[in-house]
From Swiss-Prot:
Keywords: ATP-binding, Chaperone, Cytoplasm, Isomerase, Nucleotide-binding. It is found in: Cytoplasm. The gene is groEL. Belongs to the chaperonin (HSP60) family. It holds the Pfam family Cpn60_TCP1. This is Chaperonin GroEL. Together with its co-chaperonin GroES, plays an essential role in assisting protein folding. The GroEL-GroES system forms a nano-cage that allows encapsulation of the non-native substrate proteins and provides a physical environment optimized to promote and accelerate protein folding. It comes from Prosthecochloris aestuarii (strain DSM 271 / SK 413). GO terms for molecular function: ATP binding; ATP-dependent protein folding chaperone; isomerase activity; unfolded protein binding. PROSITE patterns: CHAPERONINS_CPN60 (PS00296). InterPro entries: Chaperonin_Cpn60_CS (IPR018370), Cpn60/GroEL (IPR001844), Cpn60/GroEL/TCP-1 (IPR002423), GroEL-like_apical_dom_sf (IPR027409), GROEL-like_equatorial_sf (IPR027413), TCP-1-like_intermed_sf (IPR027410).
Amino acid sequence: MTAKDILFDAEARAKLKVGVDKLANAVKVTLGPAGRNVLIDKKFGAPTSTKDGVTVAKEVELEDAFENMGAQMVREVSSKTSDVAGDGTTTATVLAQAIYREGLKNVAAGARPIDLKRGIDLAVKDVVAELREISRDITGKKEIAQVGTISANNDPEIGELIAEAMDKVGKDGVITVEEAKGMDTELTVVEGMQFDRGYLSPYFVTNSEKMDADLEDPYILIYDKKISNMKELLPVLEKTAQSGRPLMIIAEDIEGEALATLVVNKLRGTLKVCAVKAPGFGDRRKAMLEDIAILTGGTVISEEKGYKLENATISYLGQAASITVDKDNTTIVDGKGQADDIKARIGEIKGQIEKSTSDYDTEKLQERLAKLSGGVAVLNIGASTEVEMKEKKARVEDALHATRAAVQEGIVAGGGVALIRAAKALDATNPENEDQKTGVDIIRRALEEPLRQIVANTGTTDGAVVVEKVKNSEGDYGFNARTEEYMNLIEAGVVDPTKVTRTALENAASVAGILLTTEAAITDIKEDGSDMPPMPGGMGGMGGMGGMM
């Protein structure tokens, strides 16, 4: 076992604080509209320029192991806030640094760390309740655009694009961010349900120019097994041919005789047909087939449910206004399913998302939800250089997360004002003793820190003066760092999602509390290279090879 180095009490906390400060100081220069960029060296390729707090935090790795522990604890604040709310990572880091700094002063003065932490937790609980109280719901496209603009570092183009995307696919719709081929940033929307399976044979194509199959007002056969025998498929084919409408077949696979017969019928013009494999795998495939059935008003023909393919009738088939199939994707537009059934299915998937503990499962469930809700929007991000494109793409992803957070829990005044307004809730907090009261006061002071830092980053105004002026005013009145004027921030579009502000404070207090109650720190002792064992012998005589030259 490797030997360990241990530091205790004040010495340990001092080392941890150095690490906390190094990381926080690198991150907090990015805060607010006047925040600066941070340049990050990459082993391969050009350096990355970013104004995203969590990206900076993830790059910080310190040489001193004890300092590094402090830095990594605060990095956790940033990462967790990003995971939950998608934005507010810099605010969370600034709050964590302030709470730890103020807490350490009081620990050094003799306060009990455990009571300080209890006071901090009490205060945070009351401030969060007040934030929820002053929060207001997002009502329209304009407010969505404002949130997107702020989170994308005051880029109105990105804010407008996100608002447009949400308008097109709904608040539950899937919006993906991709790199564009050119310099323009644009929005494309895929209407209806799309899944990544193309036609099983190019002979199904109806438009040879576009190389896709277009089916108007088709019936849809949904089967959860392979189809290789034509005999079991024949009854439903005959019934569809009599109706004169096209047929779309979605099955685990179609092969051999069955596929050949479908192709022949299509080429002869007997039946307009197209076949694709079912999307997904395993249990997810079953769920997606059920989604398609509900969307189109059909039934999944499954022997598990007691249905057999040879007994299938027209009533088992789904219907849609149109289906387009290319070599990679199938898009079902305007499925004819019952609105109540689709609504119930959406509710069921939302319930699964809430219970899900896996990020991957949550992502897949959200994709299914969007496909049922009405489409997928793709934001194609363009830029002149790869460095700019990556930076812009990261900003768009942040803005998208923040906008979703705003839709979930509403918005509060931005610019650090909401935290200062929420501090009034601390007047009613009931700490049990003097040290807990000190913990409450630590939070009261820390809540001012984001505004101080936003002002400090402008480089032109004194933070203490601005904080006092904002504290002495009411409502949404605050300092707009972009124009360096005092105004109603919500009317000016300077807003933050409540979820982002709340999560930043909760995570900052949690990690700062752990650091304050730390009494010892343990790390591996670095091994010196001089202690390495000597190279094994046995290669003697190599010196004589000089004569071979």
